[in-house]
């Protein structure tokens, strides 16, 4: 009797572990029971349940003496519940996986009979490595809300976070109106669902709990404090200002590359929905006119095909644009195929209608081979031995060049005294020279001396004739000739 009760209670314990949350004392009691009653030759069956927790069915043998009074009462209570469920005819289905608790040589059998598997190859050395599932922190099967905490500290997308959080708070309050009739409970909910500066704002602000919607007051205050939008005092003016900014941005938007169509449409659509619905048709026409290449054709199609509510649909206009874009892509593919088309295949369709006409021919295409501009490896050059004078070439001697005398420099030669270092008007000998008198007369007439008009080396040659020296030289030459004749005689 004790064995059957123990088996059923243990089975119900591991089966209900994924559905009912046991207390810590009950859980510890069952674990201690299993550790004391198990022998070394016992086998544990692991079972998988619909929940995420692993459930284990243990087959144990024990005696009546090993069960205390407190433990038997607890086991009998669980056994009664298991008997009631077994009478109903509903039994859980387990996927049995047998494994040796002590890591022995027992190997599970294969269904196909091919041979032993390698499931139990890894042996457990110490009993401390035994696996026992822990108590689950949350009740399995319980649905949890997907709403998180609102934390907008140092966030860039604050408006999106506030809008999502406000939508979920409003959904909770509207679906549970009986629990949130008092503004205090709503503020308590909003305070516990925020953190950081948003929580400090809700906690430290005095809210008007008598008039108006408390959720709307909190959202307007967040818009004012964290986004800089004055929704608390003048909400209408802020919305009008947002509409004007959206209109200006839609006017400035440009699409230069058709490949960025998706990004352009997303930006344009986001700003268009900030305006009034009655102005949508005009903005859609403006959107189509901004698209290059296919914008005009898409605009004519939109005017003919749009009717009813589709006149206000930017998505319908974007659909037409994509259809026209796909047509152009197909046409470009056909043009690429036509370039590769062989004209010799035209005679297959019908007989030739040209007689005596010059046949069209095309030049053969020779593919230009690619030549590497660099080598894959660095060439190694042996360093040559230095030999002095082998490749020495003496420098050419260059003559002395005349110094160039630009205007304003005092390194030219004076034409009065023929000395470098000063001009003629500054010459110290100009008073005693005839050239100086000419210079003074020129200064009276308002004339200034200029540089020498001639460039290069200038030389003066003087040729003088002396008759007396020539006569003496001739006489000496005659005397010498007569003396030579006498000696010869």
Swiss-Prot record:
Example of a GO cellular component annotation carried by this entry: host cell
GO biological process, one term: viral penetration into host nucleus
Main location class: virion
Biased composition (Polar residues): 135-144
Positions annotated as zinc finger (CCHC-type): 412-429
An annotated Gene Ontology molecular function: nucleic acid binding
Keywords linked to the UniProt accession: Capsid protein, Host nucleus, Metal-binding, T=7 icosahedral capsid protein, Viral penetration into host nucleus, Virion, Virus entry into host cell, Zinc, Zinc-finger
Segments of skewed composition (Basic and acidic residues): 95-110
SUPFAM superfamilies: Retrovirus zinc finger-like domains (SSF57756)
Region (Disordered): 79-144, 467-489
Compositionally biased tracts (Acidic residues): 81-94
Sequence motif Nuclear localization signal, location on chain: 122-125
UniProt superkingdom: Viruses
Protein's cellular compartments: Virion; Host nucleus
InterPro entries noted in UniProt: Caulimo_coat (IPR001988), Znf_CCHC (IPR001878), Znf_CCHC_sf (IPR036875)
Function per UniProt: Self assembles to form an icosahedral capsid, about 50 nm in diameter, nm, composed of 420 subunits of the viral capsid protein. The capsid encapsulates the genomic dsDNA. Following virus entry into host cell, provides nuclear import of the viral genome. Virus particles do not enter the nucleus, but dock at the nuclear membrane through the interaction with host importins.
Protein family: Belongs to the caulimoviridae capsid protein family.
Quaternary assembly: Interacts (via nuclear localization signal) with host importin alpha.
Protein name per Swiss-Prot or TrEMBL: Capsid protein
């Amino acid at each position: 009797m004790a064995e059957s009760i123990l088996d059923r209670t243990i089975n119900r314990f591991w089966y209900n572990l994924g559905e009912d949350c046991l207390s810590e004392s009950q859980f510890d009691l069952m674990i201690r029971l299993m550790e004391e009653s198990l022998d070394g030759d016992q086998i544990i069956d692991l079972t998988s349940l619909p929940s995420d927790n692993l459930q284990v069915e243990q087959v144990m043998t024990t005696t009546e003496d090993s069960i205390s009074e407190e433990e038997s009462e607890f086991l009998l209570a669980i056994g009664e519940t298991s008997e009631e469920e077994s009478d109903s005819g509903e039994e859980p289905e387990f996927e049995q996986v047998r494994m040796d608790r002590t890591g022995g040589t027992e190997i599970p059998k294969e269904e196909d009979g091919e041979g032993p598997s390698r499931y139990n190859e890894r042996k457990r050395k110490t009993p401390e490595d035994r696996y026992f599932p822990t108590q689950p922190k949350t009740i399995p099967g319980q649905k949890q809300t997907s709403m998180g905490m609102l934390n907008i500290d140092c966030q860039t997308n604050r408006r999106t976070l506030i809008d999502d959080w406000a939508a979920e708070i409003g959904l909770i309050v509207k679906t549970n109106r009986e629990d949130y009739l008092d503004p205090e409970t709503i503020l308590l909910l909003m305070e516990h669902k925020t953190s950081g500066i948003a929580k400090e704002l809700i906690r430290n602000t005095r809210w008007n709990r008598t008039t108006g919607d408390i959720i709307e007051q909190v959202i307007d205050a967040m818009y004012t404090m964290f986004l800089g939008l004055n929704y608390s005092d003048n909400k209408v003016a802020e919305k009008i200002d947002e509409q004007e900014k959206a209109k200006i941005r839609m006017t400035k938007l440009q699409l230069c590359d058709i490949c960025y169509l998706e990004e352009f449409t997303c930006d344009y659509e986001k700003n268009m929905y900030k305006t009034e619905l009655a102005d949508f048709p005009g903005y859609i026409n403006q959107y189509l006119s901004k698209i290059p290449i296919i914008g005009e054709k898409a605009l004519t199609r939109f005017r003919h095909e749009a009717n009813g509510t589709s006149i206000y649909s930017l998505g319908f206009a974007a659909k037409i644009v994509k259809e026209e874009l796909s047509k152009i892509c197909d046409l470009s593919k056909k043009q690429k195929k036509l370039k590769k088309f062989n004209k010799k295949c035209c005679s297959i369709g019908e007989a030739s209608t040209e007689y005596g006409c010059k046949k069209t021919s095309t030049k053969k295409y020779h593919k230009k081979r690619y030549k590497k501009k660099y080598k894959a490896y660095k060439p190694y050059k042996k360093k040559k031995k230095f030999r002095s004078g082998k490749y020495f070439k003496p420098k050419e001697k260059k003559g002395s060049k005349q110094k160039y005398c630009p205007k304003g420099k005092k390194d030219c030669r004076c034409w009065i005294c023929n000395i470098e270092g000063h001009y003629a008007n500054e010459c110290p000998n100009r008073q005693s020279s005839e050239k100086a008198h000419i210079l003074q007369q020129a200064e009276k007439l308002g004339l200034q001396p200029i540089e020498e008009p001639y460039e290069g080396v200038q030389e003066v040659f003087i040729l003088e004739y002396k008759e007396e020296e020539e006569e003496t030289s001739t006489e000496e030459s005659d005397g010498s000739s007569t003396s030579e004749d006498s000696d010869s005689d």
